Amino acid sequence: MINSKSKKKESNALVLKSLLREPYNKVCADCKRNEQPRWASWNLGVFICIRCSGVHRSLGVHVSRVKSVDLDSWTDEQTENMTRWGNERANLYWEAKLAGGHVPSDSKIATFIKTKYEFKKWVLYPEIPSPETLKPEQNTRPVSEVNASLDLNTASRSSSAHSVKSTSSATVTNVTSKKEAISATTSLAQSSPNLASLSKQPSTVHAPSTRQRDLKSSILSLYASPRPQVSSSSITTNATYQNLPSPVSTSTTSSQPYGAFHQPATTGSSFVADKWKMPMFTSNVTSAQPSARASPVQSNSSRPRSSLDSKIINSHDVWK
């Protein structure tokens, strides 16, 4: 009996090892990442990794019953169920509504397993059918090959993204260089009028100098004009005024206040009035000969008193 039981265990272990050599059973049925799974849910008929086995245990034995391939002993019923199902047929039923080769997110693996087996969201039928009725498609590939193709696709996408980034950076560099060239051309075009204005500056400088020369010549012409000549009549008038006697000072008058000027002159003495008015007239004499005019009042010591002056001063009848 003991030998038969031990032989059964050994035969069951050999069957499980042979099942693990199949392509679809080399990768975990749930996460599809970890290879060489050493755990299994015998009622569901799937081989899983140690991480997913912990999630299966949390679902409860009414959903999944987990055993170790190496450490636990397997019965004939358990081994037969694993032989009937396997990862390929199990996923054909439990993931029927998912896209082929779907790989769940590593951070949401627990939610994925719970939704897959407990809520039965992606099952093919509400009732679990016989595994022999589930025929895998001819063009289906093992999960390991799918993962390899996914890795290749990811690498190609990353390389294409890198090439796109390099192309975009090269385009940006070209655009930047073009903008710099345009800005340099614009700056040169803006600086060219300044150069033209610099070349025209000497002509603008000569114009004020010419005007200054004209102004200086006009001023010099004014100063260089001949001085006006004094007419002969003005010279004769000056000589006449020089020969006339000058009025005497008030010291030789009478004892009365203001002397002979106390009474106003009558109309009959027109000669005296005209005589005293003569020095007050303005003649044609210019300021060019200031020394020709005699001072209106001179002292008694400058020249001798004439008889006419004494008559004018001492004669009282003249002022009547």
UniProtKB/Swiss-Prot annotation:
- Cell compartment(s), UniProt: Cytoplasm; Golgi apparatus
Q: Name one GO cellular component term.
A: cytoplasm
Gene3D superfamilies for the chain: Arf GTPase activating protein
Location of the region described as Disordered in the Swiss-Prot/TrEMBL record: 153-212, 227-261, 284-320
Q: Ranges of Low complexity compositional bias?
A: 154-176, 245-257, 295-310
Swiss-Prot/TrEMBL keywords: Cytoplasm, Golgi apparatus, GTPase activation, Metal-binding, Zinc, Zinc-finger
One example of the protein's molecular function in GO is: zinc ion binding
Map the zinc fingers (C4-type) to residue ranges: 28-52
- Regions crossing the membrane: none
Q: Where is the Arf-GAP domain?
A: 13-132
Q: What is its main location?
A: cytoplasm
**What GO biological process terms does the UniProt entry carry, in alphabetical order?**
endoplasmic reticulum to Golgi vesicle-mediated transport; intra-Golgi vesicle-mediated transport
Residue ranges the record marks as coiled coil: none
Q: What name appears for this protein in its UniProt entry?
A: Uncharacterized protein C824.09c
UniProt lists compositionally biased (Polar residues) regions at 183-210, 228-244
* Pfam families registered for this protein in UniProt: ArfGap
Reported function = GTPase-activating protein for the ADP ribosylation factor family.
Domain of life according to the entry: Eukaryota
